[in-house]
């Protein structure tokens, strides 16, 4: 009977394996036949075609065609008969006497399928714990056993405490007592819990016996060092509780000598040490020192701020005084100390003479200061931007130069920024040599569009050297070694483009001109098309979004040399009859602040030459 049941189970298992979908791995639901003659669920194959246009069979990896997939009547009937067979098999199991003895709530616990939905409690956020008819056997967790105490301590009886007799004791007995401690140490190191020693065992330990044994081996160490060698943690313990030990043993702390604390130290120069004279208190009051007499000869310096000068006078007089008593100590001052003190006193004198109290100032002086402050606030502050340093060898020197200039001149009248913006007034070309630059940068173009003053690097150096913000007239950029493919007429002049931009205060270079700058035409690895749009807008140009139904007059469609749309540039030029130029025409026009001829910048010729 068991063999028949086993064969039936194997046959049903093979049938179930053959009727399983290769995508969802469950029994077919509405099966269809694919072009590779494999069968899948209709919902599974439709979901695959919705996610991908090109679907491969998960079994043979061949490309499937959705239109060629068709229904299979035979497979559909086979699946239905299989489901009926499983339903009948379930009913037969329910009718068997073996399962009738089980309560209905535990009849299908092995399959984890509820007999009735009402058994699951409602409004419960989690599933009930499974209750099996045959419970699992409890499994014990493996835990490390507690280490057993050493057998030597268990077998050896406690010995009474005897007075120490180091001379008569045999070293063999000491070794027998040391061995259990070494064994205990090894057991404690391998155990997982701290080993606890009883109080009786601690009483039986003779520390002097161990100390004497250590001193016999090495006579250089004393008893305290031997104790620390025997118990290393004792050193830190005694150090932390040194005060309590002194109280327990009634040891008085050492007294501090108060004589050095009461001694006064006066500083004097080497010349004063030669003429040093010890005076009494009465003599010091009758004859004041020489520095006080010198200060008393010029009282007019301290008329305005008497309180401040009294304080500074006292501090200034205390240093050169050489009056000393029996407890005084005279220390020779370092060279130049007296000179530094005189300089400090001179600085205090200048500060007090230049600043007076409001009560002593005249209304005219107050009004002059207010006018000066209003004049400073009314002026436009200088906002300085420095170009990037492209030379690695000069980068460190340039950064130090910028740091010195920043810390020296940062104020309300002089500010700094990282990029050129609407508040920028000056651009410093860090790669300049004298009043000439080798190439033009993006910051240079932004400075021309913002009508900024462009100066060379030497301006920073001279400002730091003199300590003043010098005029920019002698440090402006007047030439550039890089050339453009267009010759500028002599009638226009040879001045730089930033000078033309500043002379045209209210005008715009591209006023009344329209530009079509599309991303697909202006892709450039060295220059972002968004920066190009921003430069054109700052120069007064109008940016268009499409180029249909537009007048070709003053219309420019911009391409990049790196663009591959050469055919489209030809079609646009033939269709709309407008100027189709490269972005270099825009950049060179801004750098020279002129509307340059477009013939050398034709996009058709430039793109073709680059691709060739």
UniProtKB/Swiss-Prot annotation:
Q: By its UniProt entry, which Pfam families does this protein fall under?
A: BRCT_2, zf-C3HC4
Reactions mediated catalytically: S-ubiquitinyl-[E2 ubiquitin-conjugating enzyme]-L-cysteine + [acceptor protein]-L-lysine = [E2 ubiquitin-conjugating enzyme]-L-cysteine + N(6)-ubiquitinyl-[acceptor protein]-L-lysine
Tell me where it resides: Nucleus; Chromosome; Cytoplasm
Disordered: where is this region?
Answer: 140-173
Instruction: Tell me which Gene Ontology terms the entry assigns under biological process.
Output: apoptotic process; cellular response to ionizing radiation; DNA damage response; DNA repair; double-strand break repair via homologous recombination; embryo development ending in birth or egg hatching; meiotic chromosome separation; mitotic sister chromatid segregation
Enzyme Commission (EC) number: 2.3.2.27
Q: Does the keyword Cell cycle apply?
A: yes
Start and end of every BRCT domain?
A: 415-477, 505-603
Q: What superkingdom heads the lineage?
A: Eukaryota
Mark the transmembrane ranges.
Answer: none
State any single GO MF term: ubiquitin protein ligase activity
**Cellular component annotations (GO), alphabetically ordered:** BRCA1-BARD1 complex; chromosome; cytoplasm
What InterPro entries has UniProt attached to this entry?
A: BRCA1-associated (IPR031099), BRCT_dom (IPR001357), BRCT_dom_sf (IPR036420), Znf_C3HC4_RING-type (IPR018957), Znf_RING (IPR001841), Znf_RING/FYVE/PHD (IPR013083), Znf_RING_CS (IPR017907)
Keyword set, alphabetical order = Cell cycle, Chromosome, Cytoplasm, DNA damage, DNA repair, Metal-binding, Nucleus, Repeat, Transferase, Zinc, Zinc-finger
| Subunit relationships | Heterodimer (via RING-type zinc finger) with brd-1 to form the core CeBCD complex. Brc-1-brd-1 heterodimer-containing CeBCD complexes bound to chromatin are activated as an E3-ubiquitin ligase in response to DNA damage. The heterodimer interacts with the recombinase rad-51 following ionizing irradiation; the interaction is direct. The heterodimer interacts the E2-ubiquitin-conjugating enzyme let-70 following ionizing irradiation. The heterodimer interacts with the pro-crossover proteins msh-5 and syp-3.
What the protein does comes down to: E3 ubiquitin-protein ligase that specifically mediates the formation of polyubiquitin chains and plays a central role in DNA repair. Plays a role in triggering cellular responses at damage sites in response to DNA damage that may be induced by UV and ionizing radiation for example. Functions in double-strand break repair, and is required for homologous recombination between sister chromatids in meiotic and mitotic cells.
UniProt cross-references to PANTHER family, sorted A to Z? BREAST CANCER TYPE 1 SUSCEPTIBILITY PROTEIN (PTHR13763:SF0), BREAST CANCER TYPE 1 SUSCEPTIBILITY PROTEIN BRCA1 (PTHR13763)
**What name is this protein filed under?**
Breast cancer type 1 susceptibility protein homolog
Name the source organism.
Caenorhabditis elegans
Q: What gene is it encoded by? A: brc-1
């Amino acid at each position: 009977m068991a063999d028949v049941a086993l064969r039936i189970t194997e046959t049903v298992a093979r049938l179930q394996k053959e009727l399983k979908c290769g995508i969802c791995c469950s029994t077919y639901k509405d099966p269809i036949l694919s072009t590779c003659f494999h069968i899948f669920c209709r919902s599974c194959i439709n979901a695959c075609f919705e996610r991908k246009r090109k679907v491969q069979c998960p079994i043979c990896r061949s490309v499937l065609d959705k239109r060629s997939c068709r229904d299979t009547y035979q497979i559909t009937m086979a699946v239905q008969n299989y489901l009926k067979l499983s339903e009948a098999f379930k009913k037969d199991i329910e009718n068997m006497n073996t399962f009738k003895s089980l309560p209905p709530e535990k009849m299908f616990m092995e399959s984890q399928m509820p007999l009735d939905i009402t058994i699951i409690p409602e409004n419960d956020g989690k599933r009930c714990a499974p209750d099996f008819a045959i419970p699992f056997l409890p499994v014990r967790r493996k835990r490390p056993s507690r280490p057993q105490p050493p057998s030597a301590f268990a077998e050896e009886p406690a010995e009474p405490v005897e007075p120490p007799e180091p001379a008569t004791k045999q070293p063999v007995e000491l070794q027998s007592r040391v061995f259990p401690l070494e064994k205990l140490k090894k057991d404690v190191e391998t155990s997982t819990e701290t080993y606890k020693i009883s109080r009786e065992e601690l009483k039986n330990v003779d520390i002097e016996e161990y100390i004497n044994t250590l001193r016999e081996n090495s006579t250089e160490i004393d008893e305290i060092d031997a104790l620390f060698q025997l118990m290393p943690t004792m050193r830190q313990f005694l150090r932390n509780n040194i005060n309590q030990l002194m109280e327990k043993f009634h040891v008085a702390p050492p007294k501090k000598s108060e004589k050095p604390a009461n001694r006064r130290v006066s500083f004097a120069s080497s010349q004063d040490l030669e003429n040093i004279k010890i005076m009494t208190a009465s003599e010091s009051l009758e004859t004041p020192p020489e520095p006080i007499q010198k200060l008393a000869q010029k009282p007019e310096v301290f008329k305005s701020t008497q309180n401040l000068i009294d304080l500074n006078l006292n501090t200034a007089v205390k240093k050169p005084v050489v009056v000393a008593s029996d407890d005084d100590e005279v220390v020779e001052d370092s060279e130049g100390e007296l000179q530094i003190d005189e300089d400090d006193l001179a600085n205090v004198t200048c500060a007090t003479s230049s600043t007076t109290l409001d009560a002593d100032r005249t209304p005219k002086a107050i009004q002059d200061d207010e006018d000066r402050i209003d004049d400073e606030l009314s002026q436009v502050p200088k906002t300085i931007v420095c170009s990037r340093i492209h030379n690695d060898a000069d980068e460190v020197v340039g950064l130090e130069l910028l740091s010195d200039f920043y810390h020296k001149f940062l104020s309300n009248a002089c500010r700094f920024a990282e990029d050129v913006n609407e508040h920028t007034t000056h651009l410093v070309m860090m790669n300049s040599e004298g009043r000439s630059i080798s190439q033009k940068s993006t910051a240079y173009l932004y400075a021309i569009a913002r009508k900024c003053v462009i100066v060379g690097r030497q301006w920073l150096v001279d400002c730091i050297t003199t300590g003043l913000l010098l005029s920019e007239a002698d440090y402006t950029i007047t030439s550039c070694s890089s050339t453009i493919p267009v010759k500028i007429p002599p009638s226009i002049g040879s001045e730089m483009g930033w000078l033309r931009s500043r002379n045209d205060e209210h005008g715009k270079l591209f006023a009344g001109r329209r530009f079509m700058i599309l991303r697909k035409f202006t892709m450039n690895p060295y220059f972002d098309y968004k920066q190009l749009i921003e430069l054109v807008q700052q120069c007064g140009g109008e940016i268009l979004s499409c180029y249909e139904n537009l007048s070709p007059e003053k219309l420019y469609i911009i391409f990049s040399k790196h663009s591959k749309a050469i055919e489209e540039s030809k079609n646009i030029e033939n269709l709309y009859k407008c100027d189709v130029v490269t972005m270099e025409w825009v950049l060179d026009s801004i750098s020279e602040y002129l509307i340059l001829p477009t013939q050398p910048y034709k996009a058709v010729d430039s793109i073709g030459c680059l691709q060739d």
